[in-house]
Amino acid sequence: MLCFKSSSRKPLSFLQAGNLVNGDSFRHSRRNLVFFVLLAGIEGSLYISQDDVHYTLGPGEFMLLMPGHVHEGYRSSEGRLSYFWCHFRAGDDYQLVDESGVKQYLESLERSGLPKDIYLLPEHGVFANTNRISL
């Protein structure tokens, strides 16, 4: 799994956000965007692929879609579907780091005592507390 890494000294640029709500049979269109997309599942399952790797986004889960990578629905949803989406840009200094790279970076921060002024966001995962995402 990859992890988005960027300096927090350079803020991310918010573009737009919304809440998709669909009653039945939603299938995400095929796109290749120039910005990041953060998805947060609220209800139902979104069946989406990125570069032909299939994912299922369920309630309480998040996923980061990468710029310059094709994403699309690989199957229609069944029943009610709701998820939040947020489009944002990062500065040119962002990196996509694998798990071992993240571990090494965090260990070096602990040893050096330097300030931890970075954003780290895995490409997918589960929210620890879903109370805030179901506003």
Q: Where in the sequence are the language-model features?
A:
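Short acidic-glycine-tyrosine-enriched beta hairpin
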Residues: D52-P67
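Short beta-strand segments
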Residues: L39, L64-L65, W85-R89
